[in-house]
């Protein structure tokens, strides 16, 4: 994952609205805790977040949930509990969902995180991981995200942030992407800003012609 994967995404400047819930934990249901969260509404962090958001805000905000096919149980629970006020997205999210929303909420450190950072789309993360399995370098990135008010360890804290800042998300985000810590994060994750396909193909062809299997 990196510049070769994301650099062909076409950016648009259309007016964005609403919040997209983009869960990744649904992709890892083999883990017991994740299985419980994916299929039990009251254990699901997106439901907790939705409940904590002010009633007045919920009347104004357009919510969409990117629902993984395996989460039919969760979908039915959402529809019943919200009186069908939340919409579901099923499209491939690469490059054509995040950019349409005022804010994206993710719950894991997987592909959506890298795409959002690469394209500088406004987002927050809700994750209470103890970070034991991460490298020291990635832990530094997570600490930067936390200090920028992008990473939250509880649904209540994330909801408080949304309640306070939703109307000014664009202004907040424009300040975030100019901050030194965000630039450090982006540089750490994407040392190559843009992937040069022609250069790669030419280099590959040259090495093949030489009979050298090492690509420079």
Predicted regions and their residues:
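Conserved catalytic-core segment of nucleotide-activated headgroup transferases in glycan assembly
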Residues: 4-80
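Structural motif
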Residues: 18, 102-103
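Catalytic binding pocket for nucleotide-activated donors in carbohydrate/polymer assembly enzymes
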Residues: 1, 78-83, 103, 108-190
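Soluble or luminal CAZymes and related metallo-dependent hydrolases
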Residues: 38-48, 150, 157, 196, ...
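C-terminal alpha-helical cap of glycosyltransferases
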Residues: 183-216
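Residues at the C-termini of beta-strands that transition into short coil/loop
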Residues: 2-4, 23, 65, 92, ...
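Short acidic alpha-helix that forms the nucleotide-activated donor recognition element
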Residues: 91-101
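Active-site donor-binding acidic/aromatic loop of nucleotide-activated sugar
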Residues: 83-92
